[in-house]
Amino acid sequence: MPLSLSNRDQNSGHLFYNRRLRAATTRFSVRMKHDDRKQTAALALSMVLVAIAAGWMMLLNVLKPTGIVGDSAIIGDRDSGALYARIDGRLYPALNLTSARLATGTAGQPTWVKPAEIAKYPTGPLVGIPGAPAAMPVNRGAVSAWAVCDTAGRPRSADKPVVTSIAGPITGGGRATHLRDDAGLLVTFDGSTYVIWGGKRSQIDPTNRAVTLSLGLDPGVTSPIQISRALFDGLPATEPLRVPAVPEAGTPSTWVPGARVGSVLQAQTAGGGSQFYVLLPDGVQKISSFVADLLRSANSYGAAAPRVVTPDVLVHTPQVTSLPVEYYPAGRLNFVDTAADPTTCVSWEKASTDPQARVAVYNGRGLPVPPSMDSRIVRLVRDDRAPASVVATQVLVLPGAANFVTSTSGVITAESRESLFWVSGNGVRFGIANDEATLRALGLDPGAAVQAPWPLLRTFAAGPALSRDAALLARDTVPTLGQVAIVTTTAKAGA
């Protein structure tokens, strides 16, 4: 008898009948609102995933067993958090992670194990660098920016300025602005008087009336403020502003009949303006209105005004540049009221693609950063520094500021790359030995270090030098280093 084979529709109906019968017996309903096939598939998939995860964990346990020292160079105690440097099969307690990395010569992470695992190994004395940072994250800022600021005390007082060192670009923050080209600040340092103008400082003699009159300065009205050595060293300097010494001054000129050497000449320009010249033995030199006033204030040779000459006289007279006055101001200065605007800063900025740095002077009623950054200011403990110290009173490291640097000079055209430093978030600079073993252990590339001017960089607190040799020094205990201060807590302050 031939077989009676079922077709596709019969099979589907039979399976449907079985599912409906199963639903009726298990759920007491034949409406089949829930598909058992999907639940079965999900359960099977879950079991497969669990099996895969369990197998992966077993494989990891074989390849890298948890809680076993193995070949790890840096070991950490799970319970206490203590770190050990594994050297020649012996575990040496390390002061911090940076010291452990330097001592072992590796930049790896600690392997955390139980105390029982550590007890299996012989131990040695304490190694490491006291005060070294626990971690050294590197911020590669687009611009290397540094500043030092003085906030002056009361006018005519002996109050010393509060010095703030800033790492990171400054924007003014609504409290300070660039010192205008026609503005000046009268300051004193170490018994001498200076004028800060045009991003630089120039020494003056306040008793020289020719200089003060030409500057627009009345010493009886404008009082100088004392500046710190940090700000003084950070400002580019010019030669002193004094009356230029003109050779053979007062002798008759061979170029302009009736005029004397050292006298000031004035010529009208095509645009209706005036250009000043000083008559020298070998010709005439173009000068600014400030230098013209300065020369005439010293000796006008009886003339009430500069002698006006026609352009043809200048054409037939040699143009020279023998008088060194190129660094003098262009005109009179408007002196800042330091009682209203007591904060003065010098900033240094340079991007990696810049041919030279940019130096600027800021002045205003407060630090040139947003007020929201004031809470990030760290007051350094070393407030009892010597008078000649350049260490700041307080520091501010702005978010994202470049912190792996190589020192260079304060000259804007400086291209040197000298010592390596890493600056912490609390304003401590750590010198880094420029050798392969140290750099490899710290995971640093000296080529990635950005330039930073040493006159500003040295105002940050000095931390210990970081090197592999220093990290391998063994000791029984750590003596107290540097200055200390008591941290005042809220509970203690209210007691």
UniProtKB/Swiss-Prot annotation:
The enzyme's E.C. designation: 3.6.-.-
Membrane topology: Single-pass membrane protein
Record flagged with keyword Transferase: no
UniProt cross-references to InterPro entries, sorted A to Z: T7SS_EccB, T7SS_EccB_R1, T7SS_EccB_R3
Source domain of life: Bacteria
Keywords tagged on the record: ATP-binding, Cell membrane, Hydrolase, Membrane, Nucleotide-binding, Transmembrane, Transmembrane helix
Subcellular location: Cell membrane
Keyword Ribosomal protein found: no
Transmembrane segments: 43-63
Gene Ontology MF term list: ATP binding; hydrolase activity
GO cellular component, one term: plasma membrane
Function (record text): An ATPase.
Subunit composition and interactions: Part of the ESX-2 / type VII secretion system (T7SS), which is composed of cytosolic and membrane components.
PANTHER family on file: ESX-2 SECRETION SYSTEM ATPASE ECCB2
Entry similarity comment: Belongs to the EccB family.
Protein name: ESX-2 secretion system ATPase EccB2
Top-level taxonomy: Bacteria, Bacillati, Actinomycetota, Actinomycetes, Mycobacteriales
